[in-house]
Amino acid sequence: MPPRPSSGELWGIHLMPPRILVECLLPNGMIVTLECLREATLVTIKHELFKEARKYPLHQLLQDESSYIFVSVTQEAEREEFFDETRRLCDLRLFQPFLKVIEPVGNREEKILNREIGFVIGMPVCEFDMVKDPEVQDFRRNILNVCKEAVDLRDLNSPHSRAMYVYPPNVESSPELPKHIYNKLDKGQIIVVIWVIVSPNNDKQKYTLKINHDCVPEQVIAEAIRKKTRSMLLSSEQLKLCVLEYQGKYILKVCGCDEYFLEKYPLSQYKYIRSCIMLGRMPNLMLMAKESLYSQLPIDSFTMPSYSRRISTATPYMNGETATKSLWVINSALRIKILCATYVNVNIRDIDKIYVRTGIYHGGEPLCDNVNTQRVPCSNPRWNEWLNYDIYIPDLPRAARLCLSICSVKGRKGAKEEHCPLAWGNINLFDYTDTLVSGKMALNLWPVPHGLEDLLNPIGVTGSNPNKETPCLELEFDWFSSVVKFPDMSVIEEHANWSVSREAGFSYSHTGLSNRLARDNELRENDKEQLRALCTRDPLSEITEQEKDFLWSHRHYCVTIPEILPKLLLSVKWNSRDEVAQMYCLVKDWPPIKPEQAMELLDCNYPDPMVRSFAVRCLEKYLTDDKLSQYLIQLVQVLKYEQYLDNLLVRFLLKKALTNQRIGHFFFWHLKSEMHNKTVSQRFGLLLESYCRACGMYLKHLNRQVEAMEKLINLTDILKQEKKDETQKVQMKFLVEQMRQPDFMDALQGFLSPLNPAHQLGNLRLEECRIMSSAKRPLWLNWENPDIMSELLFQNNEIIFKNGDDLRQDMLTLQIIRIMENIWQNQGLDLRMLPYGCLSIGDCVGLIEVVRNSHTIMQIQCKGGLKGALQFNSHTLHQWLKDKNKGEIYDAAIDLFTRSCAGYCVATFILGIGDRHNSNIMVKDDGQLFHIDFGHFLDHKKKKFGYKRERVPFVLTQDFLIVISKGAQEYTKTREFERFQEMCYKAYLAIRQHANLFINLFSMMLGSGMPELQSFDDIAYIRKTLALDKTEQEALEYFTKQMNDAHHGGWTTKMDWIFHTIKQHALN
């Protein structure tokens, strides 16, 4: 039940005509036709309707108009009651211009809330009510407890707790200031400007303070009070009393945005302050009364929805009301019967026969050999065949799944047979109540994803495709005399103890077992060294069978090396209940590991629910809100690998989202951006519903953001489809005319930026908005900053809205660059990366932050005349920087260019970022270089005539080297070039030390469906660029060679840039 695509203001019509005839059915049976303005509100329409109704028969049967509401059928084919009569006709998304007048019945407040939730998540809430699956019903009820706990937590110390939810402190994870940042201070002190509003006319007064960087906000406020009262000539005792009385009544706010310093963190731990120190700017803070902030905060109420009181439809055995037996008392092998298939659409002339391929998997690992059915003609896909698997039922692990696909086979004479998957599906062998599946089942299959190389898709989603017109496979599982349940932990522990004692009785010469018997009592020093070496191997490094045996035989010692857990779990034979039971006992008491290591246990290789719960407990214990925000994209993605709707990871993320509005904001958009994806629309939709029910008044802000995005989607659809052949001038005229319409002005002004909820988007500056020249017609939009102190941060906010480009890859690349920047900063490397804001908000729809005062290399080169544009003058860029940064600031600009160039050289090389040309490398006026448009990474570079167009590992042209060497002709012989190389080497080795983190982050994204991130083979490119099979010295030599290739091969890049420039000029 995915959301339907937007189709405009009426079904199949992007924009209603300015005036439209609306058919209105009254309660007395009369139909009245009204001519309405497209932007008319429902209250206006109702008033006009009842005036007109007086001219019709039976009007005396009507009550007062306030007794009624409108109802109609929307484009989602849903009947919707319109309680909010301020809504405009054009925003109702009607199927046809028809309105019915009714008397409202039922719980008005709940219906209004359900409509708002349905609008923001993109699907009607009533669709969840119609789902009969007990797992869905139980999840919706049970997750409300998490919502209630979070809301209670927000109100714990009201109103401070509420303020902490709405304006959570934006701080670094550690209070420690890196040495190179500390060195920018004057003996550990920082100059801060404190602003105070002194009159109703917003007159401002400022105080400049010099304070220790580790002062907490209250100390800064106290110092501001002392400075403000200096002219009052108070005695020291009076001053002390004054400070004590007032310092707790004020708070600090960042001038220009909605960031507040509400907690007792050191000043330099706040991100805004740390950024000012790094950039050499004076922080501007506003002193405001705490009560004025608290009085603005909404008091959220949380009401349990009516479905929370419904009786569960779970069957008696699910509720524990019938006799059950343990999985471990079954004494038979697993078998499954394949009955028949329907809706299998194939071309009979191209395909000889079809068959069903099946396998039992644990994550991506097969638990036994795959088994195929007989081949049958396409015209009669019936098998009625029992398939037997080489695994006993008691040996099935908790996360076991049946993977199936209908495959075609085509054979030509004398040629090898071609096997091709037509559709696939997966089924959990245990349901959400730990019960083994049994009986008959119909499974609607999924279309084969792009890039699937195997016949099965074991890490794909489990469950049936909601689209019932897809191929459907009917199958049957064995019935048992009682309901079969996976054993509980007490039984598992008992079995583990038994298997350990039994193992102790084996002699080490026992056939087939000697390599895996526990040998912890024989551990030698070189064994310990080998274990430590295995622990440091990267996640993609293959572990041999001998190494797995070695790990398992020393499993008890491994507890003393907690971070070895992922490797030990990979060594478990998951088709052996003896080993699984022992592993469960080890995990139960395993020491916590760091969050970055725990995240590895959440990717597709670790499906076991106990292992994943352990990982989440580590995150709960050690993951700061800052780090959670940093890794949120991945943590949302790995929800796809959870077996069931209700799990610890869902509860952890939901609780964090409901107690920190900034996390909640991005949590919402990361989920909503995938609601078009049928494989996750139910899971993500249910999670969005629970978030929206408990996020309080922020739902109104999300409503405004979604409404604005819908308007922009509609506008850009018209530009791409109906206006694509018009001139730029005609398109711009249409854009401005539409944006001036009342409904567009209401929707597109006065809401929080989806890119950063601390930034308000005020009035649109229409004269500054434009349609960009690329094929997808992105919009360059410009809003005023309505903050009273906007001139101290930025006075306008520019954002690019894109409809038609998948921005998920850009978003991921920018996130990785941001993490690289953090690593470098913590190691004392200031490489001044610029990971600008980027957010995917839907299917190929997203927003990009515009970086102020920046220009593409091509724009700069074109300013140097024809020679510069055609790359014949390599000094154009250096001359432009000199002109922009005259006198003393020239050296600072060159230094900034050098640092940022070094950072991007290393980052683009490691990530294999392709399609680098002079239109997607930019430079700011102050010299900072940065890259944009990350449509190709992991070495998926553009090809021409079958060859990769880019022949160098990264971009380091003569133009850049001339800037780095301050205009020297023999740039490679200068001290500046040597310094640049040293920066690159240090940056490369710093990232190499954190290779596991980057591999894990990419591995967690495998379920995203990004075209260039389909398998572990894609991620292996990072292993190659970081030379993880080499020593550190060998890796440095490898990178040095890549650097030499880059600047010696710079002429090939220049040739590519020449052709790109010529092409762009031809297009324009």
From Swiss-Prot:
UniProt domain C2 PI3K-type: residue ranges: 330-487
Stretches assigned to the PI3K-RBD domain: 187-289
Region of interest (Activation loop), ranges: 931-957
Domain PI3K-ABD stretches: 16-105
Domain of life, per lineage: Eukaryota
Annotated keywords: Angiogenesis, ATP-binding, Kinase, Nucleotide-binding, Phagocytosis, Proto-oncogene, Serine/threonine-protein kinase, Transferase
Biological process terms in GO annotation: actin cytoskeleton organization; adipose tissue development; angiogenesis; autosome genomic imprinting; cardiac muscle cell contraction; cell migration; cellular response to glucose stimulus; cellular response to hydrostatic pressure
Pathway(s): Phospholipid metabolism; phosphatidylinositol phosphate biosynthesis
Domain PI3K/PI4K catalytic: 765-1051
InterPro entries the UniProt entry points to: ARM-type_fold, C2_domain_sf, Kinase-like_dom_sf, PI3/4_kinase_cat_dom, PI3/4_kinase_cat_sf, PI3/4_kinase_CS, PI3K-type_C2_dom, PI3K_ABD
Region (G-loop): 771-777
Described purpose of this protein according to its UniProt entry: Phosphoinositide-3-kinase (PI3K) phosphorylates phosphatidylinositol (PI) and its phosphorylated derivatives at position 3 of the inositol ring to produce 3-phosphoinositides. Uses ATP and PtdIns(4,5)P2 (phosphatidylinositol 4,5-bisphosphate) to generate phosphatidylinositol 3,4,5-trisphosphate (PIP3). PIP3 plays a key role by recruiting PH domain-containing proteins to the membrane, including AKT1 and PDPK1, activating signaling cascades involved in cell growth, survival, proliferation, motility and morphology. Participates in cellular signaling in response to various growth factors.
Domain notes: The PI3K-ABD domain and the PI3K-RBD domain interact with the PI3K/PI4K kinase domain. The C2 PI3K-type domain may facilitate the recruitment to the plasma membrane. The inhibitory interactions with PIK3R1 are mediated by the PI3K-ABD domain and the C2 PI3K-type domain with the iSH2 (inter-SH2) region of PIK3R1, and the C2 PI3K-type domain, the PI3K helical domain, and the PI3K/PI4K kinase domain with the nSH2 (N-terminal SH2) region of PIK3R1.
Protein name: Phosphatidylinositol 4,5-bisphosphate 3-kinase catalytic subunit alpha isoform
Highest classification ranks of the organism: Eukaryota, Metazoa, Chordata, Craniata, Vertebrata
